[in-house]
Amino acid sequence: MSASSTPRPVMLVILDGFGWREDESDNAVRLANTPTFDTLWATSPHAFLKTSGEDVGLPDGQMGNSEVGHLNIGAGRVVMQELPRISRSARDGSLAQNPALLEFIAALKASGGTCHLMGLISPGGVHAHQDHVVALTKIVSAAGVPVAVHIFSDGRDTAPRSGEDFIGKFLKELPDSVQIATLSGRYYAMDRDRRWERVALAVEAIRDAKGPHAKDALSALQASYASDKGDEFVLPTVLGDYAGMKDGDGILACNFRADRIRQLLDVLVLPDFTEYDSGRKVKFAAVCGMSRYSDHLAPYMSILFPKVPLDDLLGDVVAKAGRTQLRMAETEKYPHVTYFLNGGREVQFDGEERILVPSPKVATYDLQPEMSAPELTDKAVAAIESGKFDMIVLNFANPDMVGHTGSLSAAIKACETVDQGLGRINDAIVKAGGVLLVTADHGNCETMRDPVTGGAHTSHTLNVVPVILAHARGETIHDGRLADLAPTMLALMGVKQPDAMTGVSLLESA
């Protein structure tokens, strides 16, 4: 099929966190007034995609997430994720022989410094896993290096107040010699939206031992609960007699997902950090991370688990075919339609343009469930009408980001806002003679109440997600998984699917 005979643009709209569940109870997707989605569902070919577990390269039963989802979408194949890879290394003993870890330990033994081991302590498995942190702590401690642990509490990929149980379990598994130094809610330590005032509080506690004090982690957690702040929002707290970082110490960052650990490390590690006046710079003997976090951090730290390179990605194949493409999102999901969709690489392909709309500056998105969807929609419609692009990928962040707040009413509003945007985009696609694929990367806001605890449900789900193919004449689609989206888009564009893409086009005619 020649480029001139294919529909243009082929547009993928990702409704982030918009999963499928038949039961309407506490289901923002079903309770929302979504006339555009409903009409497209009723009048267009549709199916379901699997977004969790082994279908996206995770352990069986592990919920998907935005990073994993976009990696699989962009790769057009199931991508083995860091979680099972690292877990296997910890189980079989190879982690203790990891060359980067051995070099890190040697540097600290030579300097006489402390290993500041930091990360999300949670069984959630989205950004980190506490079992990995336990394994690393035991290895470093057994080598004779003092260890100070900086706990980031979850409450987002886990129930909002579940930290007391699994942090308690984590503490019992650590060697007696380990110091528990600080406790910070991920709202502060793992911000990714350049809210430097949040990050600064975590930095002051971790680096300088400044901030509220508590005798131990569980006391700090209980005090936070007493002030009606769940795990995610624990104010960065200094524990026991922790006195801060000193020259010759080292950092071992245990998050394997990059997007929410980068900012904290930027402040602590980068010698030329200028986003705010962050105070003193510690001269670290070594800095090591679980994975590659960014190009600008890479010169200053080693990596335990380098990414397995991916070739022939969706964006790469489209560029090599001489086609144009556009990636669009607001701040919260911009890395996903760029960095993660491009295989975890900070590369911009020939003919690839990008549009970033700033996310609103609010404490939590239930306060503004519309987020920046209206502005993003304006730019999407203009891009479609421009006729410049063969492929457009757009992410609406609202269902996921508002779903994480646990507010059902706000999540309903988020879904309704996105549907309004989808309506305008659909109209523009029809006028342009294009094709529209609508789907999600994982579930979230279709389950807003925890069926076990009865409390708010703020994490992702294992549910399938819908996929709709609109305005592709004569085509029908079948069920699949996220890895099948890239082959589908290439088929719609008349571009040959490379052998490296092992996903299967959803088109029945393919």
Curated annotation (Swiss-Prot):
The keyword Metal-binding applies. Keywords: Glycolysis, Isomerase, Manganese, Metal-binding. GO terms for biological process: glucose catabolic process; glycolytic process. InterPro entries: Alkaline_phosphatase_core_sf (IPR017850), BPG-indep_PGM_N (IPR011258), Metalloenzyme (IPR006124), PGAM_B_sf (IPR036646), Pgm_bpd_ind (IPR005995). Pfam families: iPGM_N, Metalloenzyme. The keyword Metal-binding applies. GO terms for molecular function: manganese ion binding; phosphoglycerate mutase activity. It catalyses: (2R)-2-phosphoglycerate = (2R)-3-phosphoglycerate. Binds 2 manganese ions per subunit. It comes from the Bacteria. Pathway: Carbohydrate degradation; glycolysis; pyruvate from D-glyceraldehyde 3-phosphate: step 3/5. Its EC number is 5.4.2.12. It is an enzyme of class 5 (isomerase). Signal peptide: none annotated. This is 2,3-bisphosphoglycerate-independent phosphoglycerate mutase.
